[in-house]
Structures are given as structure tokens and as C-alpha cells.
Amino acid sequence: MRMIAITATFFLLFAVSASSQQGESAGNTTDDSTRAFLLSAADIAAHAAELDASVAYANTTVLERADPASTTGLAYRLAVDRRTPPQRAAQHAAEAELWAIVGGSGAITTDGRIVNIVEDGQTVGRRIEGGTVHRVSKGDFLVIPEGVPHQVTEFDPSLLIVTFEIPR
């Protein structure tokens, strides 16, 4: 139920901010958990423009709220990510994620199991075996529960994602 409420809240935040092009952002309220936080379409574009294009997994945290009672010390985190090849598979035991695709298109593989990629006796990466491929493009949302393997596996030319991380 908590995940549904958080997902619905994030969806409404994103839908309102993406459709509103007027007014200025209220600014970063990272340290003030008593105020709302707006991540406007203009803010997303500005953060994306600052990401290093030469880094396969470039991101910047735009909002982070603490919760000393959680296992990670965080209540939640919001970030702007740009994904380009190559990407490694990931799995988080104590963190769910909501990905809002805000630019580009591609595929994200989830579920299955993570296996090592071995070349000449050396582990050179990780991939998902037996997973589900989700074709995604701007406007799509993907909920990744804690413990679920996930990996961006196709890019056209990259994926720009607003990631909402929810430690459990």
C-alpha cells in the first residue's frame, strides 16, 4: 500500500511539473522536509544538460530526504539519470525504484536472475538471464520492487530517466 501511495504521489508530481511550463521552480528543498518540492520540465532539462555525456551512467541527485529509522538512513531520493551503453544489471535488496522515462527510448530488462559475463576467464560485467524486456519511451513509468533485477539493455540513442528511489 505504501508503494502505491508513493507511486501515485510521484506520478502526480511528475504529471503536473511536466505539463506546467510557467512560473519558476521553488528551488531545492532538500533540507526542508516540511515543504513540497517541484522538479519542473525546465529543471529536468537543465540537470540533463549538466550530465557528463561520456559517462554511461550519469546522474545527479535533485532531492534527498533523511529518515534515521530506515535501514539506509534515507526516506527517499529523486535523481535525473542519463543511461548509455554499457550498463550492468543491478538488484537492490532494500530499495524499490520508480523510473519515469523523460527522454529517448530503449528497453529495460527486469526479473530473471543476474549472471556474470566472463571473457577469457575474467568477469567483465553482469547481465540478466531469463528476464522480461520492457520497451520504453518518453512518458512511460516502470516500478521496480526491491529485490528485482533490472538493467537498461537497449538505447535510442540514450534514456533520460527521473528515478525515485524508495528505501525499504
Question: Where do the protein language model's features map onto the residues?
Answer:
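His/acidic/aromatic-lined binding-pocket segments of jelly-roll/cupin-type domains
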Residues: 90, 96-100, 133-134, 141-142
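Positively charged n-region of N-terminal signal peptides that target proteins for export
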Residues: 1-5
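A short, N-terminal "cap"/entry segment at the start of jelly-roll beta-barrel domains
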Residues: 20-91, 126
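A short hydrophobic beta-strand segment most commonly corresponding to one strand
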Residues: 156-168
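An anionic, turn-rich surface loop/hairpin at beta-sheet edges
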Residues: 115-138
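Conserved metal-binding segment of the jelly-roll/cupin
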Residues: 136-149, 153-155
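Bacterial N-terminal signal peptides
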Residues: 6-15
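Short, conserved beta-strand element in jelly-roll/cupin
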Residues: 93-108, 112-114, 120-122
